[in-house]
């Protein structure tokens, strides 16, 4: 890229300190969330729709009022600062360009508002347009641009002010697959070249894994896991994180710990079982939990076809798909499969949802206001978390197996994760 734009950002670290947001109607969107983003870091907020990631971004920008907690920019508490005082620029999902202004005028506009003369603002806009590969469309109106070009213009208009923090709210979600890939690569390269602190919101795991220095995975207004892309994929903190990252989704299998007379640990999966090596660190942990119900996480590539492996599962192929570089088999093994979207959410069967649990921010807020507890939610239907389903297995591309074929699957136990019934790792590795 031609770096004619004299970009010298005033970088800053961001700290979110126990930040919460409660909307009218007592909807708790963000629940006492704490997160640190370093100077110049590219942090991705990843999670399903409605998890609070966009609300969090808007609180950082000053577009949503923080109900509790603090937002820090370096050593400055920015919680009560107006948006224009925060040194933050934000790109929205739709771009939100001025329709009656040309591309160059859109990019120049923040500089003109700041009092810069038209000649200098135009020169700066032209330099940034070269970085964004839109110099050929500077005189065109937004309605004549492609979706990718409009998003480039929106990015240029945000960056031209040299913000301390750059916020992007699902900027690629309205683009086709080819354009998403192209612009994703450009955003990653550009933000690192410009060395600006960046927060990027998405529900797309591919965007998160390819762009981020670190990923914060969110669910229900809280952070489930934070780490590098490699860490959150290979060493997930919860079953939800393991299930949210990866295609095909990880197999989450309901199991019961069984300790033999010789202190060997087996994991019973219905009428089948697998054993852990006695030297495996997880054996030492599970040895004291005989009879405990756990969840075994195994990605599709942890399985292989076998005839004589010591740890194997037997099943029948229900479906077989060719994916170009690999084949995917759906094998019925008669094992209960856990839904990662529900695990950790169901109320304990022995208590009401509010019992034996640390009060949340919302309940404490109600208490201080002198309000009673809201009525408990309806109980989860029986079997909502566990269900009978197929084990998904990745096989070599040249494998040809017919539906109904009986197969034996070796499971590499060194590649499995073990979670408790709340979805948290039993064998958690401290980062």
Regions of interest found by a model, annotated:
Residues 46-48:
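The feature captures the beta-strand-to-loop junction immediately N-terminal to the Walker
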Residues 68-77:
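Conserved ABC transporter NBD signature motif
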Residues 81-245:
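ABC ATPase nucleotide-binding domains
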């Amino acid at each position: 890229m031609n770096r004619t734009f004299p970009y010298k950002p005033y970088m800053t670290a961001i700290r979110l300190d126990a930040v919460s947001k409660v909307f009218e109607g007592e909807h708790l969107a963000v629940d006492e969330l704490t997160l640190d983003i370093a100077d110049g870091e590219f942090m991705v907020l990843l999670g399903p729709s409605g998890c609070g990631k966009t609300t969090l971004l808007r609180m950082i920008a000053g577009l949503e009022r923080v109900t509790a907690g603090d937002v820090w920019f370096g050593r400055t508490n920015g919680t009560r600062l107006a948006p224009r005082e925060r040194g933050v620029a934000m790109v929205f999902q739709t771009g939100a360009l001025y329709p009656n202004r040309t591309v160059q005028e859109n990019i120049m506009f923040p500089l003109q508002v700041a009092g810069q003369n038209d000649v200098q603002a135009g020169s700066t806009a032209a330099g940034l347009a070269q970085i964004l590969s839109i110099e050929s469309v500077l005189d065109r109106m937004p309605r004549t641009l492609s979706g990718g070009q409009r998003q480039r213009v929106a990015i240029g208009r945000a960056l031209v002010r040299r913000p301390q923090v750059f916020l992007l709210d699902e900027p690629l979600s309205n683009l086709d697959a080819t354009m998403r890939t192209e612009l994703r690569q450009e955003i990653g390269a550009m933000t690192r070249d410009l060395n600006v602190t960046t927060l990027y919101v998405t529900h797309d795991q591919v965007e998160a894994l390819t762009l981020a220095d670190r990923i914060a995975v969110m669910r229900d207004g809280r952070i489930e896991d934070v780490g590098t892309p490699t860490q959150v994929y290979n060493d997930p903190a919860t079953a939800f994180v393991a299930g949210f990252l990866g295609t095909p989704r990880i197999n989450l299998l309901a199991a019961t710990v069984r300790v033999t007379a010789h202190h060997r640990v087996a994991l019973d999966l219905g009428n089948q079982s697998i054993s852990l090596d006695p030297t495996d660190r997880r054996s030492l942990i599970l040895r004291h939990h005989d009879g405990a119900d756990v969840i075994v996480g195994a990605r599709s590539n942890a399985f292989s076809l076998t005839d004589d492996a010591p740890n194997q599962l037997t099943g029948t192929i229900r479906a077989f798909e060719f994916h170009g570089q690999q084949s995917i088999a759906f094998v019925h093994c008669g094992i209960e499969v856990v839904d990662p979207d529900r695990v950790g959410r169901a109320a304990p069967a022995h208590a009401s949802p509010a019992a034996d649990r640390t009060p949340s921010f919302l309940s404490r807020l109600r208490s201080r206001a002198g309000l009673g507890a809201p009525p408990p939610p309806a109980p989860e239907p029986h079997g909502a978390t566990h269900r009978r389903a197929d084990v998904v297995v990745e096989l070599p591309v040249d494998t040809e197996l017919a539906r109904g074929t009986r197969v034996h699957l070796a499971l590499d136990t060194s590649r499995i994760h073990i979670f408790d019934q709340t979805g948290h790792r039993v064998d958690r590795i401290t980062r």
